[in-house]
């Protein structure tokens, strides 16, 4: 069990909000980083003690990471506001994140920098080692549990998001499988230097994740955004599956959201299970496909893959030109996940127009990676595959 300390304005609301998340074991309100030992609420209220209303959070980092806790905390505050949150004013209501383990500094500062970059200006949130913490009076502990109608500076939408976020995590954990939790990190290449480095898995199958997403298909964009920031792979997938449902009812906002939150679409299954059904579906209905070529030029491989895989919906409508152009752009790509994506889309074209695919292969097979070629001709007869592979092999030998 680990500890972190959050100051987010009135500690009644902050404790209730943070305490709702799965993995948070215990919370305690108190007064932190002031000059007076063991102060009372009345003394802190004068703003002369230097103390800040604070919540001590004890959590299981096997369920929720410090980085995720910090991101969720930032969702509950206005990080630009000085000595004020909601209607509460005074230095006791300043915001901050304080740690007792120096190893936690890196995670706090990483999230802090992310938020500061998003706002584009300095944050008014303290971040440093805890100097002191004194528990508040019993009256202030679990105040909103004991007084459900009591004062809370946080909005109802923020509290609802926290409650539903916790429900999603609980449902995913309940659906997890111990064996899959061991196998999936290897399958998705999460080792150092691999494409999925650092990704974490609960061990939930896609069908079970779909079931959880379906139960939360009316979720807010705020919840989807929070889930996309999770370290858990299945949480991000669940968010994307919810977003697909959103797209069916409100396509324009859903596509805009998707394109501005691609950082969380960072493994091949997350791309393949979302891009065709959000961006791809959007492209079928809209003539401007420039976004595909913007994504294709991205230095982020996942965004490159999104550009290619999104065209699956166009292919299903027998519109092949964008796929062909992108296949030419990525003819000499070195990453096997891009080679496979291009080959996959070419194969889909071949299912509908084999002559067009054969013409493309005859023109470009000399530059085409063998992986791309193998994927593209998977539906060909054994003789056709053998002939193309042999011709490719001869070309490769000649080049050497």
Can you say where each PLM-predicted feature lies in the sequence?
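Flexible coil/turn and secondary-structure edge motifs
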Residues: 1-167, 215
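Alpha-helical scaffold domains
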Residues: 107, 165-400
């Amino acid at each position: 069990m680990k500890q972190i300390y959050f100051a987010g304005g009135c500690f009644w609301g902050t404790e209730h909000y943070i305490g709702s998340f799965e993995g948070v074991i215990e919370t305690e309100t108190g007064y932190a980083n002031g000059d007076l030992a063991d102060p009372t609420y009345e003394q802190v209220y004068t703003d002369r003690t230097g103390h800040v209303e604070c919540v001590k959070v004890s959590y299981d980092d096997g369920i929720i990471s410090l980085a995720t806790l910090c991101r969720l905390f930032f969702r509950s505050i206005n990080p630009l506001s000085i000595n004020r949150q909601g209607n509460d004013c005074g230095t006791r209501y300043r915001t901050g994140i304080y740690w007792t383990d120096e190893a936690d500094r890196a995670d706090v500062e990483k999230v802090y920098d992310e938020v500061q970059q998003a706002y584009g200006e300095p944050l008014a949130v303290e971040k440093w080692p805890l100097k002191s913490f004194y528990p508040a009076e019993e009256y202030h502990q679990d105040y909103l549990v004991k007084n459900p109608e009591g004062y809370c500076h946080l909005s109802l939408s923020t509290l609802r998001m926290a409650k539903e976020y916790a429900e999603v995590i609980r449902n995913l954990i309940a659906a997890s499988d111990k064996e899959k939790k061991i196998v999936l990190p290897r399958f998705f290449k999460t080792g150092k230097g691999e494409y999925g480095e650092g990704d974490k898995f609960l061990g939930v199958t896609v069908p079970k994740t779909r079931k959880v997403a379906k139960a939360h298909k009316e979720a807010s964009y705020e919840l989807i955004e929070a889930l996309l920031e999770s370290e858990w792979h299945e949480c991000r997938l669940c968010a994307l599956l919810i977003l697909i449902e959103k797209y069916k009812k409100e396509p324009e906002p859903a596509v805009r959201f998707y394109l501005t939150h691609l950082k969380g679409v960072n493994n091949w299954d997350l791309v393949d299970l979302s891009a065709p059904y959000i961006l791809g579906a959007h492209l079928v209905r809209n003539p401007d496909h420039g976004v595909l070529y913007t994504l294709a030029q991205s230095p982020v491989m996942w965004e490159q893959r999104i550009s290619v895989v999104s065209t699956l919906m166009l292919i299903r409508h027998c519109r092949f030109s964008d796929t062909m152009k992108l296949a030419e752009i990525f003819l000499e790509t070195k990453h096997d996940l891009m080679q496979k994506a291009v080959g996959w889309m070419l194969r889909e074209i071949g299912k509908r127009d084999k002559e067009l695919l054969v013409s493309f292969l005859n023109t470009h097979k000399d530059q085409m990676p063998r992986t791309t070629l193998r994927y593209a001709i998977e539906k060909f007869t054994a003789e056709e595959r053998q002939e193309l592979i042999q011709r490719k092999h001869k070309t490769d030998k000649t080049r050497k």
